[in-house]
């Protein structure tokens, strides 16, 4: 079954488990957990992905990481984001 999966990511992601925050351009935001990350995107978990804006900034304070991004898919509490 796995041989039929087509990988669409531009870069391999690395498994992590880090606390983060999605900072919205209107000043709001939500906490998240970063599950994997690459130079081009990440998979994050949020309490409720409904209502996420079209773009936001992913912050990982422990790594001094800040990157504009946008969601490309979501399933339950999982969200895939692409970096801008």
Regions found by a protein language model. Give the residues of each.
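Short, conserved beta-turn/loop elements at beta-strand boundaries and strand-helix junctions
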Residues: 25, 39-40, 74-78
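Short, surface-exposed beta-strand-loop junctions and turns on beta-sheet-rich folds
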Residues: 50-52, 74
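Short acidic/polar mixed-charge low-complexity motifs
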Residues: 26-30, 63-65, 77
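N-terminal helix initiation/capping motif
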Residues: 1-35
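Short beta-strand-centered aromatic/proline hotspots
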Residues: 31-34, 67-72
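Short conserved beta-strand and strand-loop elements enriched in small hydrophobics
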Residues: 18-23, 53-62
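Short, solvent-exposed secondary-structure boundary/capping segments
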Residues: 42-46, 77-84
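Short alpha-helix capping/helix-loop boundary micro-motifs
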Residues: 6-10, 40-46
């Amino acid at each position: 079954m796995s041989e039929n999966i087509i990988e669409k990511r531009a870069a391999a992601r690395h498994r992590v488990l880090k606390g983060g925050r999605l900072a919205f351009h209107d000043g709001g935001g939500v906490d998240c957990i970063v599950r994997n990350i690459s130079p081009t995107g990440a998979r994050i978990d949020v309490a409720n992905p409904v209502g996420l804006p079209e773009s936001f900034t992913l912050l990982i304070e422990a790594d001094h990481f800040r990157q504009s991004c946008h969601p490309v898919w979501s399933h339950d509490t999982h969200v895939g984001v692409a970096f801008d």
